[in-house]
């Protein structure tokens, strides 16, 4: 077995690439399909068995019985690089009927008449359009972390193959933060634009930083004074689509024409981040975006017009672009589609993502919190985030700061020097050394003491065989 490191695993954990080795069965299926690894991890791609499913469901083949572990490495019945890529970039959705919608005419008609539709009527139409969302089994609702779970399973297999108790890695967040949260405000129409100043007051009153995604054309005028008013208060400005008509990713020619203007607006606005309107997306085209990061891909998209989801609660790279996935239910969906002002769903998602050390990416539109009931729910959310920063070591950051950190972490190295593991590279003074350990068939994380070096015997990476 010719075993090598897994790029997706070492990039995710930022662990030494010389310790764990994996190989892929040479005889994979010719077609891609759904299967699972263990009870809970749905995969999509080729496998060494031909019994793959066209749709996700309860009776998927479990490929874990075909995994071989020995002292030299792990032989896998699938290519994990392919599986991770297919999930993150939503390639499973393009090939699966339950995610596709033949609704171009309906969408065109809706966005043509939308300016004259009252909100109550739009909510009614959206509920009809989204009917059946709760029957979708994959990705998991209300948060999906299939990619993260898959990589954790691979880490466990790798540790077992070498008889290791633990392996060092660079912790996910700076200063040892347990998790990260970003607040983003998509400004859709002029009433929302007019409310931005009051919204900044609310954010500031709870000490929550935020970014404002601005639509450059059609929806409202974008004066330099408006942008400067946001910027000088310490908030971030990003570009949101071009004109918010839902057509950006409809045709490649349309996208290529519009993205040139979008990129120009990015430079004019001094924006390093982008988000598409209504979270329409095609990650295969993201290389045309002249931005450092994107925020257009949901973790799970059952309640979005474009179904699918990237199946992770962690940032990842799409080429040279950092993707900060939308991991929290949008305010519009929560308030206007589900009719929920209790924050119970947000609380459920917050607790889940915090427990799994992930990224909470909120979208709260100024347009949809004009009513007092919605404002009260938003204030409650801000209060929760403020308390978690103080009590639960939550990193509250601007999206651009998360982008910068994720790039710095990706460029860092974990080296063994003398008798110590050392983190090196720009930003390493904020990095924390951690280790992943096998305990009762679970992967458990723990942090080393502050500092960027630790003695090897503290991490117990010596093999048993």
Named regions from a protein language model:
Residues 234-244, 291-307:
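Acidic, His- and aromatic-enriched active-site or binding-groove loops in soluble protein domains
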Residues 295-299, 304-335:
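Catalytic pocket-lining loop regions of alpha/beta-barrel enzymes
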